[in-house]
């Protein structure tokens, strides 16, 4: 820019006032002298203006672009006239940031795509993110001469493949520098490219004042909706932008890779933006020009105008402006061009350009912006049947469909004691209700087997016992899981229904038999613990006691060789009466064995204590652990109610206690026996006078062992009958009592189970500590006593 000498306008000096009389002449001349203005260029030799020219990054045509946009009358000698410190600073700046070598352009016959493998962060919340990371990649800009199309941004041949972008940093200090480190060989080597500061200028001014038409910030080539306003947010100068340009390596071919990261240097420190440790990667894909369909239906003439070579006399700015003008025209759509082209079932590649699909690959291939037509997939009908088909029945014409077949769980036989749990009580005379009919399919086989066993007698009793052994084990597991959830009223009702059903069965059998000739010889041979044993936690009701008493008397009448005796005046004499008669079970050689009355255990383990050949649920599966037979014994006596005054009145008899002794095999010496006393409400009991017990052959099956008080498994090999206190039977009775007996404290009358011996020691220590420290808190008046008490209790319980 040529400078001209300043032209000073002529000054008209006003007429000096006439000096007053008596004033000196020198002061008058000083007041009239004109003022003189001195400029820096004339006085000091400094220029009035400085002009700097920046070379754009457009490659070989950068000089023409600069000349077309910012040429003046004397632009050629601008650098020559720039002398002094400013000229030296410009030379140092050019040396510090040398221009990158011009990249090798792609041949004019083809074009290329730039495929980034990362996603940019959204503009929303950018200021908050910059407060944490200090620097981030804001946008990737299309290369010069890019053509937007349906398959992405395509660059025609003859253009150098470069990557351009914007970096946003937090303005922490005035002195700052941004560099982009790029690598073409997987970080074997790298090069740092400086990023240039982008001033806050309106859109379209470009970078460095290149003027309108520079595609760096043009929304038509690379910046999506809202990206333009996000590029220059009104953040009050809190952030700054830097622009960079990265060339690909010389001779880059299809699949060339460019990795880069951003470094932000400030006096406070150095910060990096590396895509969360994964680096930023851009791939180069060589591809021909897009078709009108791929270019969103652009007319063929516009495509040819965009792809035709530019004349040499035409500058890049005019060429880019022409392309932008054609791209900004409204898109014309034709109906026949929007018709979707069907794909073949065997070939998934594009019908128009199969080579493009193969070169781009399935992952990095450019995806079209318009939606593809909805494809309808026909699924053959599948017939679902309840019965699973065989492998050979699957039709080969249809593809196999994987259906997961859920097999039904095996039906669990619900026991009569648990069929109506939680239901309202019903009258026995009204017959079976709906719940009994619903469960009939599960209970009918069991009832038929029971009736068949009653009719068959003792000859076919053993097979029926084996058929019923598997049911009680499953039933007890179900009952054990539900008894904790039931209340006392519900259990009373179920127990009453059990008694009524069992008593009605006994009455029906007695009525059908017509006497002792057809009555069953061994009632307990077909009865299981399902009918006779319940885990009863509460007291019995009056009706239940009466029903249990009647059932007991029924079994007492059926016994062979059993005679009820009258109780003596002496209650301590348990083994004899006034008539001197006792209940004597008949020998198995002479007739059927004696029938023992059923016991209903409360709060104890399920154990059947009978005499003679009786089926025991836990005995027939314990042969794997114990080889000796199982013998069960009872101790008690029938006594007469003094109020009745009749020796034969059996309704006044009540079961007092049943003592079950469990000992191990006879071959083991020094074994311990566990005794359980189960008291009831009355004091009368059964007293057998037999001197020997008959062993019971058990079946070879497995069964869960009975648990002792400490949780250990106790193998129930034999149960012995203890001593009889009567003097008449003392000499002839068989003493099966074990020599050693574990100490068992006397349990209170209300408790059904005795306390374990292992708990007496800790309980005694705990009571002693409580008695000794009851007055310590009052005496010490502090929290130390409580701590001592807690420690003592912990040592007592967990030692």
Swiss-Prot record:
Chain positions covered by the region annotation Disordered: 1-30, 53-108, 201-235, 332-353, 417-439, 566-600, 663-688, 722-743
Biased composition regions of type Basic and acidic residues, renumbered to the chain: 334-353, 679-688
Tissue specificity of this protein: Highly expressed in brain (at protein level).
Topology, Cytoplasmic side: 1-772
Membrane topology: Single-pass membrane protein
Function in brief: Glycogen-targeting subunit for protein phosphatase 1 (PP1).
UniProt-recorded name of the protein: Protein phosphatase 1 regulatory subunit 3F
Natural source organism: Mus musculus (Mouse)
